[in-house]
């Protein structure tokens, strides 16, 4: 199985995770779901539970709120869905981590991967300008991260209202 990188972008509740799951599920199982969310609040715990229930038994879940590079290295042969880069970035920001270093580590892991990977990320640059400096910094860093991932991806898909639009490559 060769490496093929897909980036799936979209707004909140756009259907991007479901679309990404479908891309991975079209490949032979088993599949690996790399989760970057942490259930720090009841609402997030409910969202995580809903995602798990939707996936089924062919999925193995790896929790990787920050060390995504190490998680990808553990998945040598199974197709991988990473959901999502947006939470991964915010986790690093809240930990006051070196974002450039962590992004470079992620890029190295993607380069070394030998299996198909689907990355999920929010497209946050189309909304209003955040009024708080941290919000603006997050929006800017997410935009740069999305650009870097899109540059290396074989395929980039934007999902709006559950409908995929190919930005790079084909559906």
What residues fall within each predicted segment?
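Structured helix-beta-strand junction loops
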Residues: 27, 57-58, 78, 113, ...
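Conserved P-loop
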Residues: 2, 6-74
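Flexible, compositionally biased loop and terminal segments
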Residues: 3-9, 34, 86, 105-107, ...
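Short, well-ordered beta-strand core segments
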Residues: 31, 80, 155-158
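Structural motif
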Residues: 7, 79-81, 118-120
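Residue-level signal for inorganic ion chemistry
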Residues: 20, 51, 81, 122, ...
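Helix-adjacent hinge/juxtasegments
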Residues: 54-102
């Amino acid at each position: 199985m060769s490496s093929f990188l897909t980036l799936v972008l979209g707004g909140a509740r756009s259907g991007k995770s479901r679309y990404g799951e479908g891309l991975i599920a079209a490949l032979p199982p088993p599949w690996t779901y790399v989760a970057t969310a942490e259930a720090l609040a009841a609402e997030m715990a409910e969202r995580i539970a809903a995602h798990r229930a939707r996936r089924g038994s062919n999925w193995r879940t790896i929790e990787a709120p920050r060390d995504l590079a190490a998680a990808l290295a553990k998945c040598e042969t199974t197709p991988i869905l990473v959901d999502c880069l947006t939470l991964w970035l915010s986790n690093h920001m809240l930990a006051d981590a070196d974002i450039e270093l962590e992004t470079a580590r992620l890029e190295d892991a993607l380069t070394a991967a030998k299996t198909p990977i689907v990355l999920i990320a929010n497209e946050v640059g189309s909304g209003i300008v955040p009024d708080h400096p941290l919000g603006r910094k997050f929006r800017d860093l997410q935009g740069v991260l999305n650009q870097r991932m899109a540059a290396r991806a074989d395929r980039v898909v934007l999902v709006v209202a559950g409908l995929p639009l190919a930005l790079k490559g084909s559906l």
